[in-house]
């Protein structure tokens, strides 16, 4: 019975074809920012190989190149986020200030 299960497992496996293999890229250069940015998510993190379908060897090369590009300031460590803060509204409702203001009458 194990023999039949092994056959089913082999049939269901699909061959992984990565973007690097499709383009015929053998060497990953840290200066190629356009290529490296395809392997970074919106928060600036390196995408895992399960998502990118890159082999373990190529994933290590990618990681090394992305880290080098970050250290050389070619890639940001994190993506820019719009920081929103609540505006500081200073309202003075103290009775002393109301009395101190001269009336227009």
From Swiss-Prot:
SUPFAM superfamilies: Ribosomal protein S18 (SSF46911). Gene3D superfamilies: Ribosomal protein S18. One of its GO terms (biological process) is translation. Residues 95-105 have a biased composition (Basic and acidic residues). One of its GO terms (cellular component) is cytosolic small ribosomal subunit. Residues 85-105 are annotated as: Disordered. InterPro entries: Ribosomal_bS18, Ribosomal_bS18_sf. Transmembrane segments: none annotated. Pfam families: Ribosomal_S18 (PF01084). The keyword Ribonucleoprotein applies. One of its GO terms (molecular function) is structural constituent of ribosome. Keywords: Ribonucleoprotein, Ribosomal protein, RNA-binding, rRNA-binding. Belongs to the bacterial ribosomal protein bS18 family. Binds as a heterodimer with protein bS6 to the central domain of the 16S rRNA, where it helps stabilize the platform of the 30S subunit. Part of the 30S ribosomal subunit. Forms a tight heterodimer with protein bS6. This is Small ribosomal subunit protein bS18. It comes from Mycoplasmopsis pulmonis (strain UAB CTIP).
């Amino acid at each position: 019975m194990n023999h039949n299960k092994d056959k089913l497992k082999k049939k269901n496996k699909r061959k992984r074809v990565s973007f690097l293999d499709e383009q015929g890229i053998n060497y990953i250069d840290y200066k190629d920012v356009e290529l490296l940015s395809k392997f970074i998510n919106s928060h600036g993190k390196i995408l895992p190989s399960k998502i990118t379908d890159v082999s373990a060897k190529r994933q290590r090369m990618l990681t090394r190149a992305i880290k080098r590009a970050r250290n050389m300031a070619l890639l940001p460590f994190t993506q820019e986020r719009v920081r929103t803060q609540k505006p500081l509204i200073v309202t003075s409702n103290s009775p002393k200030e109301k009395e101190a203001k001269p009336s227009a009458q």
